[in-house]
Amino acid sequence: MDLDQERSLDGTYIMPTFGRLPVLFTHGEGMRLYDDTGKEYLDFLAGIGVCCLGHGHPALVNALTHQTEQLLHVSNYYYIEHRAEVAALLSKLANNDMEGAERLARALRSGDAQAAMDAAQPAAGEQVWQTFFANSGAEANECSLKLARLYAQRHGNGGNAIVCLHGGFHGRTLETLAATMQERLQEPFQPLPGGFLMCEPNDIDGLQELFAQHGKQIAGILIEPIQGESGVHPLTTEFVHEAAELAHAAGALLISDEVQAGMFRCGTPFAIQALGITPDIMSLAKGIAGGVPCGACVARAEIARTFAPGEHGTTFGGSNLAVAAAEAVLCELICGAYGEHAVHAGTYLMERLDALPCVTEVRGRGLMVGCDLAPDACDAHDLVAALLDDGFVLNATGDHTLRFLPPLICTSDDINLLVDALAHRLEQAG
């Protein structure tokens, strides 16, 4: 079907939860997408930070092709081939142990089971992290919240409140929506679950006051090192360090939502690592499996073991297909130095954006970038639509804010094409 036919059926049969742009993508390769007419687009959104290797990457395609011929799903009642190995990769990445992660990744790629078994073993004194595999970022955050509260009840301070930051985004379920401190998103679905406290991002005084007032009632603090949906707003190093210190002094846990900023998008395996902080729990999704639905809650083992069988679960999470995708993506990211490339490419993108006369601020790290337009420049949503006509895919998070989340294979040539087109459209609007 062509775009018009698909739009007609979409309007009849699909719930109206998204306002869609008028394009029907049919296939992609690398940084490029193609629509039903054959038109080519440069993708600077990557399915909202999901397709970290771009489109049609051979490592992912081969892994999925092989797995679909073998086994798709059997449920969590049984052991899943390579699931523990993927969890071991995540454990080593959580320790920022790139040498250990690469040794395991190369063993997995070689197909040498004994070498992989040996590489997966934790070294003496190594912090072990355990993983619960889910299907999405919201599910990963649900698991993180449940684990933090359960840990507080059984081993911590007995609290159940979770501190969240204004402008954050943690999902669309009722619980994660309650943690998403954006009134416009929460209002239609009141009453939401309770037990959440709000603080302004980077407000150290406000955070200290919150802990002084509520102290032992707090089970955890949930942060995004870089708030994505509100326009790519990084937390300061000082604020995150204070959050960690206050949480641990109160017997609470620090939870890092790495759904958008993690998986080497900002350089380090997880964005919080660039701030010199190790959290207690992390929520992952988006880029972890390159486009196959997959999420993960990763926690220090001594915290993760709070769960007992039957206290949390999933039907589809950690399926054979999702694990195969995650293994292929993680091995490629680890062995291919994608984090270093993301930093270099992101720095160049920010420099080019910052040089545009209508841009008032550029924010971000690596290939997670946002920029604000002058209020009298043009509407960001109109600009996104115009650039789509020009063959570029990006995103607006507000009337004057653009967001860039390209695949981690993005080159300086790709960036030049985009920014030149953006400059032309801004000049026309002015």
Which functions belong to the PLM regions below?
Residues 1-430:
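Conserved N-terminal phosphate-binding loop of PLP-dependent enzymes in the Aspartate aminotransferase
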